[in-house]
């Protein structure tokens, strides 16, 4: 949208038209001067109207198209915007939310007839968990926002929509040091595919997201420097697998590798070489650290099922693949590792994310520090 800056009695209007081939922002600007005697409030409104028309002129729009049905706007969004700007997995999830929940109710409605109260009524009619409703609303929000950007509609009706409140989630327990020791003993003693055991250990030792772990290639493992480079994520949608970028830019990181981890990777390499020798050229991805038995990308869902089966009937049956990441972070924080270091280690975009997720752990750690100081001063 155009930006408006007041300078004396005039208004400076700028419109961004994206970036050129050298990644330099393309900006068009103009100045609007209201006639003398115009009240400040009226001048601001006139400037906004002028900016709207100027932006439409810059982007080549000739007329609004608010008579279009919402399904037409959504079709444009999924054909032109989503494939270029969103990750393939996100596009899949957005399309699923649209086709299953939004299109049956709003698809045939003209865009000009969709207002804030109507959207509030729509989201409140969804008999789903609040977090699911919010995900559906995000799709609506994105479609309308792009519609405004492209000049199809004047404004988005998504402002001030009343959303259901998220229910407080029951926090899943994580392992303390004593439980971790018992868990590691269970891994060693209970019968299970050794390949799966190695993945579980890597997740627990590194705190990686499961998709990051399954996206590791042998080029990412540096035995000389004892480091692991995390540069990809294994996306998994509808049975299709592909490598993509990690969750955020800060998720691209390099972490240290302990000797225990190095030994696990060497075991995995030896195991994989045996598979390749048996299968030969039919082994699809010899460059990957963790694969299926025939060398295909490892399926996260089946891995989660294997973990669930492995832990069934034990004291650890509450653990999931992702909770191993939380266990890693909790162990680090309880060991006194600096919050910023833990945040970087986990690949969080912001230290505040780490502080928010592990607020209870940090509270406990602060209490331990206070007790330690008291003991020293006693």
Predicted features along the sequence, with ranges:
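N-terminal core-binding DNA-recognition domain of tyrosine site-specific recombinases/integrases
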Residues: 3, 17, 36-43, 66, ...
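Catalytic-site neighborhood detector that most strongly recognizes the C-terminal catalytic loop/helix
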Residues: 174, 234, 346-371
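N-terminal DNA-binding module of tyrosine recombinases/phage integrases
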Residues: 7-10, 17-112, 117, 268-285, ...
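Basic, Lys/Arg- and aromatic-enriched nucleic-acid-binding interface segment
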Residues: 130, 134-136, 149, 153-216, ...
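C-terminal catalytic core of Y-nucleophile DNA break-rejoin enzymes
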Residues: 28-39, 169, 225-229, 245-267, ...
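A short, basic/aromatic helix-end/turn motif that makes direct DNA contacts
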Residues: 215-221, 343-349, 359
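Conserved tyrosine-mediated DNA breakage-rejoining catalytic core shared by Y-recombinases
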Residues: 7, 12-14, 160, 179, ...
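Short, basic (Lys/Arg/His-rich) helix/loop patches that form interaction surfaces
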Residues: 130, 185-196, 206, 255, ...
